[in-house]
């Protein structure tokens, strides 16, 4: 939802979803009375609605379902509730807590004859006359109102049998009086057919797109139910809706739900099915679909995958596609004014559709069904888990917060994955060969939070399937030293994701990018991995050289695609490793395929500026040649924080060694502090190499000892009865001493000097070292700002040219 300033407009856009409060709208409550034909209200509510005990009322539920019941008064029932038992609730397709409307229905006729059939799985093994045992006692002297399509449950003779009302005369509802003829001949109804109609999708089954649903409701339900509204105001009702959005967000589902809830005739056209090899046949298929819909008005025509049948005409080479597009255009223009036919279409590539279709009068409203935010994800998870057995520790809110960038389909997959994991845990109790599974095992199944955590580790959003990165299991503990850098990074990525309200309060947009630079082997890439793991954001790693291809224009398209994916899966961290390979200073590189590298940089620059503020996309670049990077990319607003990652000092070296050795057995007398003191000028990678070499030496010694012992045992079998201890239980001092003999520094002093000078140039030419506001409000009293800093930067800039000479 939008922020506080525009709540007014927001309320209007979703006004259609609000329940109007009227006295005849009541909340469904559990009934004490088991009778299938009774509902109970409080006496006060009955007086208000002018009902008397024993009156027949018509109840309206969801998905256009109705039921007729007899009303009773119940003093324990509160005024705004209505009590009904499970059978009535199922017929109305409502749950406890839903809202239904109630109307008096005085003129219900006595039925001449009714036809009821049992449902097959409830009558298995019953011998004897169904009518005598079940139906006769149920209807005798009861004057029950029934409606066509109702299912009712009758208990008798130790069993409960469900019946369905197939036909009533007069239709659709009547009262079963003593002289009504009851037929119960015919095949029992299959349970599956019933279940299908029970499981139809309704608006309740759609989560995460409340606003879009409101738009669609006002576009579809108003013209279908109250066309007079538009007539009165003198405009044509809209008749085309285009739903677009990434795959898996529920476009087809919304169309199905709209059809079920409005009760309109639903005609589904799958894009490719229309095509036919005969000339003119494809167009006539389309015409038939529209004719069929007009006959059965009010109707909804839903075209799935519209881009398959209506691509841009100038781009397609096939004659058939062009004719189909033209046919669709004329059909949509030719729909009669109030034929009550609405055309909905879904696609995930709205830009490849012929533009003539996207004007007013054809598909005049385009609804973007985007990737849901965390509240939307919570709604979707609740919908998918409403029939699941969850244990008490499952915290769906936390799951919703951790699934950034997931669409509805991904969340459905997540739930089923978690459920499968719960079944796997009980797998040792289940035998595939058995006919049935113990009820005990069945009852003990429940999905726990651990199952969800496991499923989370397995799932990634479908928008990122191609560029998926295994989020590395690197934590902050793995990184020795660099405390300030870690803090800056956490502020950059975690604050905007976790505390967006603070940024709103201070009226600032968070910064977008960071550039790490420094000598090789100091943990630039490692830092990016750690931040991807620590803050729950999606992570796309881009290796510079992979973007460049030999085709003209392809490299820029790659860049565009990556940024699009990142925006879809926001919050997302884009990590450009070896940034200098793709963002070289422009103009110097003549002869690389028509300046492909320059165009790639231009594309990256425009993408970075075009990152919309709404989406949390962060860019981290890493390079060890900051001097050759294009200066335009280093300005604030693109990569605005330049972080120099220096060679580790003694404290950091100590932390790096400890981080490297925290899983290794090290002898007590190995003095890591001394090791850190002696390795001045070594980078993190060099220190890791020392540790690895020491481990290698210990492993070598251990294996040699085992071979020697094996040899001794073979030569002298009797002596070696006693089992000895492990000859090399830990890494000793001599291993480290030996490893230090081979240790080498990968960064020379000369290189370090260059980096530090570059760092200083950046700091000093851009910052004021001694800037202070004048005290006491006297302007101009302090030193002129930047006098210290500016001149300090001066003597570096002269040497700038021969820095890398």
Curated annotation (Swiss-Prot):
Enzyme class: hydrolase
PROSITE patterns assigned to the protein according to its UniProt record, in alphabetical order: AAA
Residues bound to ATP 2: 521-526
Matches recorded under NCBIfam families: CDC48 (TIGR01243)
Organism: Xenopus laevis (African clawed frog)
Assembly with partners or alone: Homohexamer. Forms a ring-shaped particle of 12.5 nm diameter, that displays 6-fold radial symmetry. Interacts with the FACT/DUF complex, which contains subunits ssrp1/duf87 and supt16h/duf140.
GO process terms (BP): autophagosome maturation; autophagy; cellular response to arsenite ion; cellular response to heat; DNA damage response; DNA repair; double-strand break repair; endoplasmic reticulum stress-induced pre-emptive quality control
Lineage: superkingdom: Eukaryota
Matching PANTHER family: AAA-FAMILY ATPASE (PTHR23077), TRANSITIONAL ENDOPLASMIC RETICULUM ATPASE (PTHR23077:SF69)
Name of the protein: Transitional endoplasmic reticulum ATPase
Disordered: region residues: 708-727, 768-805
Function according to Swiss-Prot or TrEMBL: Necessary for the fragmentation of Golgi stacks during mitosis and for their reassembly after mitosis. Involved in the formation of the nuclear envelope, and of the transitional endoplasmic reticulum (tER). The transfer of membranes from the endoplasmic reticulum to the Golgi apparatus occurs via 50-70 nm transition vesicles which derive from part-rough, part-smooth transitional elements of the endoplasmic reticulum (tER). Vesicle budding from the tER is an ATP-dependent process.
SUPFAM superfamilies the UniProt entry points to: ADC-like (SSF50692), Cdc48 domain 2-like (SSF54585), P-loop containing nucleoside triphosphate hydrolases (SSF52540)
Compartments reported by the entry: Cytoplasm, Cytosol; Endoplasmic reticulum; Nucleus; Cytoplasm, Stress granule
Any GO MF annotation of the entry: lipid binding
CDD domains recorded: RecA-like_CDC48_r1-like, RecA-like_CDC48_r2-like
Keywords: ATP-binding, Autophagy, Cytoplasm, DNA damage, DNA repair, Endoplasmic reticulum, Hydrolase, Lipid-binding, Nucleotide-binding, Nucleus, Phosphoprotein, Transport
Tissues/organs with expression: Expressed in at least oocytes, liver and kidney (at protein level).
């Amino acid at each position: 939802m939008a922020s506080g300033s525009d709540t007014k407009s927001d309320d209007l856009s979703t006004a259609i979803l609000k329940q109007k409060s009227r006295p005849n709208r009541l909340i469904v409550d559990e009934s004490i009375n088991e009778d299938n034909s009774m509902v109970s209200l409080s006496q006060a509510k009955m007086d208000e609605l002018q009902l008397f005990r024993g009156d027949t009322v018509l109840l309206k539920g969801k998905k256009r379902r109705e039921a007729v019941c007899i009303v009773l008064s119940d003093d324990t029932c509160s005024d705004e509730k209505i009590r009904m038992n499970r059978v009535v609730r199922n017929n109305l397709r409502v749950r406890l807590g839903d809202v239904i409307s109630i109307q008096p229905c005085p003129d219900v006729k006595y039925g001449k004859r009714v036809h009821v059939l049992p449902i097959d799985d409830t009558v298995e093994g019953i011998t004897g006359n169904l009518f005598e045992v079940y139906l006769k006692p149920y209807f005798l002297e009861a004057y029950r109102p029934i409606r066509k399509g109702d299912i009712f449950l009758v208990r008798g003779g130790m069993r409960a049998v469900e019946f369905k009302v197939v036909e009533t005369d007069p239709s659709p509802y009547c009262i079963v009086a003593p002289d009504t003829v009851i037929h119960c001949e015919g095949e029992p109804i299959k349970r599956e057919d019933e279940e299908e109609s029970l499981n139809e999708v309704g608006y309740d089954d759609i989560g995460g797109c409340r606003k879009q649903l409101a738009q669609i409701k006002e576009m579809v339900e108003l013209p279908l139910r109250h066309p007079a509204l538009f007539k009165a105001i003198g405009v044509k009702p809209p008749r085309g809706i285009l739903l677009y959005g990434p795959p898996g967000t529920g476009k087809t589902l919304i169309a199905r739900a709209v059809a079920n809830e409005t009760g309109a005739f639903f005609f589904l056209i799958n894009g490719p099915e229309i095509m036919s090899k005969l000339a003119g046949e494809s167009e006539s298929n389309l015409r038939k679909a529209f004719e069929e819909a007009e006959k059965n008005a009010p109707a909804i025509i839903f075209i799935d995958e519209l881009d398959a049948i209506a691509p841009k005409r100038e781009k397609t080479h096939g004659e058939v596609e062009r004719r189909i597009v033209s046919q669709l255009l004329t059909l949509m223009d030719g729909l009669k004014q109030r034929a009550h036919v609405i055309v909905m279409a879904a696609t995930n590539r709205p830009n490849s559709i012929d533009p003539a279709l996207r004007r007013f009068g054809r598909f005049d409203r385009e609804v973007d069904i985007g990737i849901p935010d965390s509240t939307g994800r919570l709604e979707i998870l609740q919908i998918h888990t409403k029939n699941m057995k969850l244990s008490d520790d499952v915290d769906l809110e936390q799951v919703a917060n951790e699934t950034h960038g997931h669409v509805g389909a991904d969340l459905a997959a997540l739930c089923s994955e978690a459920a499968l994991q719960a079944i796997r845990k009980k797998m040792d109790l289940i035998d595939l060969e058995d006919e049935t599974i113990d009820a005990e095992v069945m009852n003990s199944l429940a999905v726990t939070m651990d199952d969800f955590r496991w499923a989370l580790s397995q799932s990634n959003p479908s928008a990122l399937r191609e560029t998926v990165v295994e989020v590395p299991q690197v934590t902050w503990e793995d990184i020795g030293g660099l405390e300030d850098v870690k803090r800056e990074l956490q502020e950059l990525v975690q604050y905007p994701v976790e505390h967006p309200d603070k940024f709103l309060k201070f009226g600032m947009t968070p910064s977008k990018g960071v550039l790490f630079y420094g000598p090789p082997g100091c943990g630039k890439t490692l830092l990016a991995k750690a931040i991807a793991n620590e803050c729950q954001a999606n992570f796309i790693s881009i290796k510079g050289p992979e973007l460049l291809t030999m085709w003209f224009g392809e490299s820029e398209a790659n860049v565009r695609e990556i940024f699009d994916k990142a925006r879809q899966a926001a919050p997302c961290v884009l990590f450009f490793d070896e940034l200098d390979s793709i963002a070289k200073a422009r103009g110097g590189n003549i002869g690389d395929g028509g300046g492909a590298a320059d165009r790639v940089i231009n594309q990256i620059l425009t993408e970075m500026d075009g990152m919309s503020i709404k989406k949390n996309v962060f860019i981290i670049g890493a390079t060890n040649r900051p001097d050759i990077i294009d200066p335009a990319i280093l300005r604030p607003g693109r990569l605005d924080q330049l972080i120099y990652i220096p060679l580790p000092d003694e404290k950091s070296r100590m932390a790096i060694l400890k981080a490297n050795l925290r899983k290794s057995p090290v002898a007590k007398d190995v003095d890591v502090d001394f090791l850190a003191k002696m390795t001045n000028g070594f980078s993190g990678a060099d220190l890791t190499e020392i540790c690895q070499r020491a481990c290698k030496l210990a492993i070598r010694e251990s294996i040699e000892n085992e071979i020697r012992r094996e040899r001794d045992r073979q030569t002298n079998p009797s002596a070696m009865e006693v089992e000895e201890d492990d000859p090399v239980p830990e890494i000793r001092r001599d291993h480290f001493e030996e490893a230090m003999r081979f240790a080498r520094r990968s960064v020379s002093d000369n290189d370090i000097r260059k980096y530090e000078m570059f760092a200083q140039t950046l700091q000093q030419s851009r910052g004021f070292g001694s800037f202070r506001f004048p005290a006491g409000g006297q302007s101009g009293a302090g030193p002129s700002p930047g006098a210290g800093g500016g001149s300090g930067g001066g003597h570096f800039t002269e040497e700038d040219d021969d820095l890398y000479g």
